[in-house]
Amino acid sequence: MPIFDEYGVLIFAGAIILLIGLAIVLPLSLKGWRRWPSWLALLVGVGIYFLVPLAQPPLQNWALGSFPSDVSFFIRTITLALLAGVLQELIKFLFLGGFRLLFSDNILWIGAMLGLGFGLGEGFYILYSIRNLTYSMPSFVFFLDRASAILLHIDLGFFLAYGFKRRITAAALPLVIVLHTASVYLGLLHVDKKISMWTAVGVGLAASFVLYLVAICYYFKDQRRPLKK
């Protein structure tokens, strides 16, 4: 019975995370749902997230081990955040580049779906990681935090795709790395008890929503704007 309870909670909470993600990305395009590359990008996004737990912890541990014992909190924390931002956005960038070569017509929607999949993969991984802590449903703030993270990954996937489409990846990639780094830094401030979880989630959700509105504006603006030759 405990196993059933544990996995019942996992399935139900995972379904909530999935519905949150789909509800967030839907306003960007209704037509995109009928195109199979969108679903492929979603599945690839989920899959490539699992490269992160393999590569990111060793990289961050190496960085921590190379610091002197008296390194400042800011240097330590911003380095960990930057490593996470660089690694995760480079993974998205490389796979999105492959999609750009294969499916160039709808790359903005594909970028958003790849970001959605990445955010869902992160949510499923975190949910599975905490499965032994409790048999009850995760708290409301947990789902708010996951909504914020999914929203951010959709935003960043879109901005990367926009960079590919408009041939400005040299600007888009550093931008998304900075935004991702800022988000991780905010979370680390909570982990180190510098700010409350509600503050971290609230600020993160507000910032992700603003970026989401920017992405929507750019998406519909792009539909009316010819590509540069």
Show the residue positions of the predicted features:
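Hydrophobic alpha-helical segments at protein termini of multi-pass membrane proteins
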Residues: M1-K229
